[in-house]
Regions:
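A short, conserved alpha-helix in the catalytic core of glycosyltransferases
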Residues: 43-54, 59-86
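Short, hinge-like loop/turn segments at secondary-structure boundaries
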Residues: 18-22, 98-101
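Short beta-strand-to-loop element that shapes/binds the nucleotide-sugar donor at the catalytic cleft/hinge
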Residues: 2-16
Length: 165
């Protein structure tokens, strides 16, 4: 499987394509590079891979389907690589300022609606993904984490998130 790399048009930094085991994005360097976590904006899936794995898991309607497909392929002994060069570009200013896992500066109801929306990080879908690839314990912990951080007041979240993000 080959994932196409996308760069930011002004800075020429990689912003999408694939990342390594530590979740660092992999930049174009003229060679195919191993990918752990596939980002699926531009992907070439050979017929033999599709014949073995099939379509994306239907449970994933927006988020995590690409990552799941790449991990499933690797679990079945296949490889995922980056393209050798950037094949697309975008303007970072067009990217959403809202994180999938928590929307700031809104009330709890709107925050939870976003979390459970197709553009959020639906905890049940994320639980399914985490259980499939990281086990039940990780899935349970992350499920509760998503709800906990969405209950935090913005002032607390802003302090805590600076430490992590």
């Amino acid at each position: 499987i080959i994932t196409g790399l996308v760069e930011e048009k002004t800075s020429h930094k990689v912003i999408y394509g694939g990342s390594n085991a530590t979740k660092r994005l992999i930049a174009a360097n003229g060679q195919l590079n191993d990918v752990t976590f596939l980002n699926g904006n531009f992907v070439i899936v050979p017929r033999y891979v599709f014949d073995k794995i099939g379509f994306l898991d239907k449970l994933f309607h927006h988020d995590l389907g690409d990552v799941d497909y790449g991990l499933t392929a690797q679990e079945q002994g296949m490889h995922v690589y980056t393209s050798r060069c950037y094949i697309g570009c975008t303007d970072v200013a067009l990217r959403s300022k809202h994180m999938r896992i928590r929307m700031s500066n809104v009330g709890f109801i709107k925050r939870f609606k976003r979390l459970y929306s197709p553009l959020g990080s639906n905890p049940f879908i994320t639980f399914y993904f985490k259980r499939k690839h990281q086990g039940y314990l990780n899935a349970f912990i992350y499920f509760f984490y998503l709800h906990f951080i969405n209950l935090l007041p913005d002032a607390v979240w802003n302090k805590v998130s600076r430490l992590r993000y």
